[in-house]
């Protein structure tokens, strides 16, 4: 069956059409700059890539555009071939501990969580409604970034703030990148042959977070109430003293919102280096001896190592350290700098194997006390897998209900 995975932002819509359960990517694409007359629509199949610039004023138009293109390019013959749609939703709060079939009730619940993710959930909802309008009979599912972390114990997700903040406003750690962590966890359980494996995962892209996993469940993660908490990233500061916000607001004559915006969009690699938020630019500048680039990278690596060491203690040992996402999968320098700083734990890097890019590989030596792996993530596939799982569950439930009705009435 054909399932579409969708990841929508406020001005973008990323999609992938997969044949399931074969896990075959049929087509992928992206609509950027939604809301303008200079929107960019890119669609890629196995052997061809098309790109056009056109007017796309809203998400509804973007959805209609991509679905029309699938038919025009003969990727599918009719829309009826699409049997499921999975939507990435950033914030599921404490309401959702699993992906959810999209109904009027679940959509209303997602809308109720917009305060917790004002930049993301509204855009996710707009996209969901656009797909529901064009594909009203198609099975659709919300897959949340936060659900994987709902297994964290209170001691790990609560802040030491007035408790009523949590009771009244749900102030707590929610985490992010949960879909990626769930996928990597399942991959590692297969690789290690252990369901009860203790794993530390470093998801490093422009956004960076870490997760401690025990027996398939998240027990702690670095991102918090928002993705701003944790380690420095491309443009995010990571952890800072909260008093800095008030101090800078007063000194720079800015609102608190403006300072938070600076911490989200003008900090991290970009803020410290003054060069770029892109790791490739930072690494190129490091090779040239740029001290600010070196410093920006060292700060990030130091904070990542802090989390790994903390999670090692939390888990009381670890079976594997995993690097994934854009930087984690492709930067041998990034991985090397982290592992070197963890030598006290007995982890030993295999320099030759560490040259791998974008492929699964064990990158530590045979006598390393901890195994370290590169494992590519695949969030689009993970979303499609959840759609397939929930659809099969619903089909089985419908059969059980019919059987029960037959027995009662017969």
UniProtKB/Swiss-Prot annotation:
Q: Which domain of life is it from?
A: Bacteria
List residue numbers at the site (Transition state stabilizer): 177, 236
Q: Which GO terms describe its biological process?
A: acetate metabolic process; acetyl-CoA biosynthetic process
One Gene Ontology CC term in the entry: cytoplasm
Enumerate the subcellular locations listed in this protein's record, separating them with semicolons. Cytoplasm
Can you tell me which residues bind substrate? 88
Primary site of residence: cytoplasm
* Cofactor(s) listed: Mg(2+); Mn(2+)
A Pfam family of the record is Acetate_kinase
**Major enzyme class:** transferase
Q: Which residues bind ATP?
A: 14, 203-207, 278-280, 326-330
InterPro entries the record matches: Ac/propionate_kinase, Aliphatic_acid_kin_short-chain, Aliphatic_acid_kinase_CS, ATPase_NBD
- What is its quaternary makeup? Homodimer.
Please report which protein family the annotation says this sequence is part of: Belongs to the acetokinase family.
**Role summary:** Catalyzes the formation of acetyl phosphate from acetate and ATP. Can also catalyze the reverse reaction.
Q: This protein is called what?
A: Acetate kinase
The record lists the organism as Chlorante-Aster yellows phytoplasma
What does the record give as the organism's lineage?
Bacteria, Bacillati, Mycoplasmatota, Mollicutes, Acholeplasmatales
Which gene name belongs to this protein? Answer: ackA
């Amino acid at each position: 069956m054909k399932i579409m995975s969708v990841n929508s932002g406020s001005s973008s819509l990323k999609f992938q059409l997969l044949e399931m359960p074969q896990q075959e990517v049929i087509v992928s694409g992206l609509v950027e700059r939604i809301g303008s007359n200079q929107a960019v629509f890119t669609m890629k199949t196995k052997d061809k890539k098309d790109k056009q610039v056109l007017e796309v004023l809203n998400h509804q138009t973007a959805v209609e555009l991509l679905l029309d293109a699938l038919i025009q390019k003969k990727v599918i013959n009719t829309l009826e071939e699409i049997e499921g749609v999975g939507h990435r939703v950033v914030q599921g709060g404490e309401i959702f501990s699993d992906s959810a079939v999209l109904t009027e009730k679940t959509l209303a619940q997602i809308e109720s969580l917009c305060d917790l993710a004002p930049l993301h959930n509204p855009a996710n909802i707009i996209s969901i409604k656009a797909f529901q309008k064009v594909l009203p009979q198609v099975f659709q599912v919300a897959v949340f970034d936060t659900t994987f972390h709902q297994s964290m114990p209170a001691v790990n997700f609560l802040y030491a703030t007035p408790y009523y903040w949590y009771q009244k406003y749900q102030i707590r750690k929610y985490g992010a990148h949960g879909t990626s962590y769930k996928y990597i966890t399942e991959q590692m359980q297969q690789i290690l042959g252990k369901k009860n494996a203790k794993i530390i995962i470093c998801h490093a892209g422009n956004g960076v977070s870490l997760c401690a996993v025990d027996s398939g469940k998240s027990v702690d993660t670095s991102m918090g109430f928002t993705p701003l908490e944790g380690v420095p990233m491309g443009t995010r500061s990571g952890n800072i003293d909260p008093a800095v916000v008030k101090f800078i607001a007063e000194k720079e004559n800015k609102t608190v919102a403006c300072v938070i915006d600076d911490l989200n969009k003008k900090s991290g690699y970009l803020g410290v280096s003054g060069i770029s938020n892109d790791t490739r630019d930072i690494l190129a500048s490091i090779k040239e001896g740029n001290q600010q680039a070196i410093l920006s990278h060292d700060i990030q690596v130091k904070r990542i190592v802090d989390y790994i060491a903390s999670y090692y203690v939390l888990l009381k040992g670890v079976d594997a350290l995993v690097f994934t996402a854009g930087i984690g999968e492709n930067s041998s320098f990034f991985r090397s700098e982290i592992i070197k700083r963890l030598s006290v734990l007995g982890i030993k890097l295999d320099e030759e194997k560490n040259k791998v890019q974008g492929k699964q590989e064990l990158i530590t030596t045979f006598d390393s006390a901890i195994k370290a792996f590169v494992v590519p993530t695949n969030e689009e596939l993970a979303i499609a897998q959840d759609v397939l799982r929930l659809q099969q569950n619903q089909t089985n439930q419908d059969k059980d209900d019919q059987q029960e009705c037959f027995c009662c009435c017969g």
